[in-house]
Amino acid sequence: MTPAPAPMYVPKFLMRQKLTMMVNQYEIYLANPDGSEGELMAFAQQKRMAFKEEVTFFSDRDKTRPVFSFKARKKIDLNAGYDVFDEGRQPIGSFRKDFGKSLLRSSWHLSAPGLEAFGQERNQSIALMRRLWDLIPVLGEVAVPFVFHFDFTDTIGGALVMSSERKKGIRDRYTIVVPDERVDFRLAASMAVALDALQSR
């Protein structure tokens, strides 16, 4: 029996991040057929110190209407993972970082109804260079110059379910492709933000 598609499925979207001393901002756009930014789908802004606990996404930059969110299960144990909620605070899915496997290559687990997926940095060499960069005291405070990507695959069968590709530029810009209809847009968007904001870069 084929699993039902997610309530809100978007096969491709774009994410733009803006970083300041006080807040992180993320703008998520529908991708046009030519790859350009289309409709604004969600906006998130959070104080940097609070970002690891809970993030709320809004329908516009004025933050007039919250539409989904993700929240840490335990504030003192981020290894416990994060739950993603819809506008009515109903769970959509979850994700968690695999800290053991992330020592050399950032690794995550993604869960949705009828789906368990595992994601890693695509390039092992880039992953190692990022870690060496972070070990140098001065350079560790400078934005990482390496372009890195993540791929998530179904733990049963190994099919690609989601990918996040970072683009070169002053700001962080990402293209997120979701081939698997079981992955809700709100879960994919939350995971995409987490890949940027919740790991040491």
Residue spans for each PLM region:
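Intrinsically disordered, low-complexity proline/glycine-rich segments
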Residues: M1-R201
